[in-house]
Curated annotation (Swiss-Prot):
<dbReference type="Pfam" id="PF03489">
    <property type="entry name" value="SapB_2"/>
</dbReference>
<feature type="disulfide bond">
    <location>
        <begin position="96"/>
        <end position="107"/>
    </location>
</feature>
<feature type="domain" description="Saposin B-type">
    <location>
        <begin position="62"/>
        <end position="142"/>
    </location>
</feature>
<keyword id="KW-0044">Antibiotic</keyword>
<keyword id="KW-1015">Disulfide bond</keyword>
<dbReference type="InterPro" id="IPR008138">
    <property type="entry name" value="SapB_2"/>
</dbReference>
<keyword id="KW-0964">Secreted</keyword>
<dbReference type="InterPro" id="IPR011001">
    <property type="entry name" value="Saposin-like"/>
</dbReference>
<keyword id="KW-0295">Fungicide</keyword>
<dbReference type="GO" id="GO:0097013">
    <property type="term" value="C:phagocytic vesicle lumen"/>
</dbReference>
<dbReference type="GO" id="GO:0050832">
    <property type="term" value="P:defense response to fungus"/>
</dbReference>
<dbReference type="InterPro" id="IPR008139">
    <property type="entry name" value="SaposinB_dom"/>
</dbReference>
<feature type="signal peptide">
    <location>
        <begin position="1"/>
        <end position="22"/>
    </location>
</feature>
<keyword id="KW-0732">Signal</keyword>
<protein>
    <recommendedName>
        <fullName>Granulysin</fullName>
    </recommendedName>
</protein>
<comment type="function">
    <text>Antimicrobial protein that kills intracellular pathogens. Active against a broad range of microbes, including Gram-positive and Gram-negative bacteria, fungi, and parasites. Kills Mycobacterium tuberculosis.</text>
</comment>
<dbReference type="GO" id="GO:0031640">
    <property type="term" value="P:killing of cells of another organism"/>
</dbReference>
Amino acid sequence: MATWALLLLAAMLLGNPGLVFSRLSPEYYDLARAHLRDEEKSCPCLAQEGPQGDLLTKTQELGRDYRTCLTIVQKLKKMVDKPTQRSVSNAATRVCRTGRSRWRDVCRNFMRRYQSRVTQGLVAGETAQQICEDLRLCIPSTGPL
């Protein structure tokens, strides 16, 4: 018990309390924070995130939202040959009808929130990745932790 308290005190004095309370090893902690420096070029939405206690949760959420975005936008692109406001809007009402009920709920929530910006991106000829990054749903280039 005394050893643990001493280690806790030493870590606090060294100015790294996040490492102590997250129970990460120093090597893993450095890898977990490494993407924050690299993302300024490839993913601006993560460059603004600071090192916080729930870093892994935020990264996992971004990954799931990003995959959802890519899937929906790619399905929309397949459904629409020449994207116009009307054709994308019609396809958007059909895209969430396929799949399981959980997927439908996720898809409907996504479309309710982002449909206008996704439509603008498709009409402008952007790729699915560009649209999802514009929505600030990008994931780190180092991959999931």
